[in-house]
Amino acid sequence: RASKVHKPASLVLSLLAAVGSTREDQQQLAYQRGADRWGGKPSMTRLEYFDYQELNQALDSLRDLSPDLTQRFIDACAAVVQADGQLTGDEFALIKGVATTLGCPLPPLEPNP
């Protein structure tokens, strides 16, 4: 169930939002687009610093999702990185890594310089 992984899902969506913008209002907007797609009411995780171990633990938890929920989560990730109409190289690399780790195809995305 999606509700069992709200915390790890929130962490990944929050990280994607933070990578996409330095402005907190834009991060919150991007995060909310992804959270709406994901479902439920996970709140954005404030990231003081990047922690690879925490990200790996979150992805380990998300690996247990059903294929349908995994695709919905990747779609939520895509909603975050596309919220501002631009896809940076860093956003693309991160979402591609998440999708690869979860064994799920990405929807069509094109990086913008």
Question: What positions do the PLM features span?
Answer:
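Small-residue-enriched hydrophobic alpha-helices in membranes
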Residues: 1-113
